[in-house]
Design a protein with these regions (language model features):
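A solvent-exposed interaction/effector surface
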Residues: 2-6, 12-205
Length: 205
């Protein structure tokens, strides 16, 4: 998906779901278990999300927005949360480089904490599904600036190098997390890259 389309989609949802730009959004709770110079390690609990799988050419963003806008079995309007996340779905039977190039994208909106898999309204669109994102440890690098692939790849590589240097095992691909509305100045933006890791808290304090 091109940078232009990504930016257009981000503008679309934040414009429709906010009346101001200082609005506080709920985000999944986590504990910071260790801080390094350029990244931190967080521990998340299980989280409920609404998810769609889509190709690079056909964004599924609008279908997730329709779900929180009322395209669900209760016709509920669900409050926006942050972050919006994107990752590549990896087919483990093929080489990683090939699956990243030809793979599917996953986009997720996290639901407010009051919802569970049992009480959350079901999507009316079969392309959209409710999923429980299992908790665990994630290495996270924060960065500001525009939401471009170049900016993402620069910090992805930085996080990957830091994990290798600290001998921390991680699972590709990285997850792109976006927190801000479209009119936030680039230097004030909160962007993150998250990487699922194997981490032993007892032996890493």
């Amino acid at each position: 998906m091109s940078n232009t389309r990504i930016n257009t989609l981000i503008i679309f949802i934040f414009t429709l779901t906010t009346t101001g730009f200082a609005m506080a959004y709920e985000e999944p709770k986590y504990n910071i278990v260790k801080t390094y110079q350029e990244f931190e390690i967080r521990k998340y609990d299980d989280r409920l999300a609404v998810e769609i799988e889509y190709s690079n050419e056909d964004s599924g963003f609008r279908y997730l927005f329709k779900y929180i806008a009322g395209a669900n079995t209760n016709s509920d309007k669900i409050k926006m949360t942050v972050p919006v996340t994107q990752s590549v779905k990896i087919d483990m039977t093929t080489p990683v480089t090939q699956s990243v190039k030809n793979g599917k994208m996953l986009m997720q909106f996290f639901l407010p904490s009051k919802f569970t898999l049992e009480n959350a309204p079901q999507p009316t669109d079969k392309r959209v599904s409710l999923v429980v994102i299992k908790g665990g440890h994630y290495a996270v690098i924060k960065y500001s600036g525009r939401l471009t692939n170049q900016n993402y790849l620069k910090h992805y590589k930085k996080l990957e190098n830091n994990l290798n240097n600290n001998e921390i095992d991680f699972i590709k691909p990285g997850i792109r997390a976006t927190y801000n509305g479209p009119f936030t100045l680039p230097f004030l933006r909160r962007n993150e890259i998250m990487m699922k890791i194997t981490f032993d808290e007892e032996n890493n304090n």
